[in-house]
């Protein structure tokens, strides 16, 4: 059975600092699902690799420079959403250059994996919470 839903390709990062904190960004006002917390990233443009898209998006959104060689594949999300089907590879990144700032006016927070349940997130991100807790063996 084929679906008439559009396939949306997104690439996202789980940024982890030296203290094993995870960066969450809040979706800005005026964007779909505004106010929810998510892992930074964005849409993959035609002809662009997921890694190239992610390095571009992290610079555009957070003003940090990442190298494709420093992206470690973690998992992916394949989610049938209301109006589209989401396919999103996620990468763990522990190395970047620059100071993180929300260039689109979004708020961001460094949190422990044990705190992930306290932040409202888009439905496709929810299955990542236990995986991240297990990875970081948080609290």
Label for each model-derived stretch:
Residues 2-5, 133-139:
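Generic C-terminal helix-cap and adjacent flexible tail
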Residues 21-60:
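Conserved Nudix-box catalytic region and its N-terminal flanking loop in Nudix hydrolases
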Residues 8, 17, 75-99, 109:
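Active-site-adjacent beta-strand/loop module that shapes the phosphate/pyrophosphate-binding cleft
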Residues 1-22, 43, 76:
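Conserved N-terminal beta-strand and adjoining loop/helix that marks the start
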Residues 65-75:
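A short coil-to-beta-strand element that immediately follows conserved catalytic motifs
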């Amino acid at each position: 059975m084929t679906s008439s839903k559009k396939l949306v390709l997104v690439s996202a990062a789980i940024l982890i600092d030296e203290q094993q904190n995870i960066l969450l960004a809040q979706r800005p006002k005026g964007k779909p699902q505004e106010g929810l917390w998510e892992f930074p990233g964005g849409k993959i443009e035609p002809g662009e690799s997921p890694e190239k898209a992610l390095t571009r998006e992290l610079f555009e959104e957070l003003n940090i420079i990442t190298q494709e060689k420093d992206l470690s594949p973690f998992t992916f999300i394949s989610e049938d959403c209301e109006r589209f089907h989401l396919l999103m590879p996620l990468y763990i990144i522990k190395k970047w250059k620059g100071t993180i700032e929300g260039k689109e006016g979004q708020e961001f927070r460094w949190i422990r994996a044990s705190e992930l349940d306290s932040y409202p997130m888009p439905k496709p991100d929810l299955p990542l919470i236990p995986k991240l807790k297990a990875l970081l063996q948080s609290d």
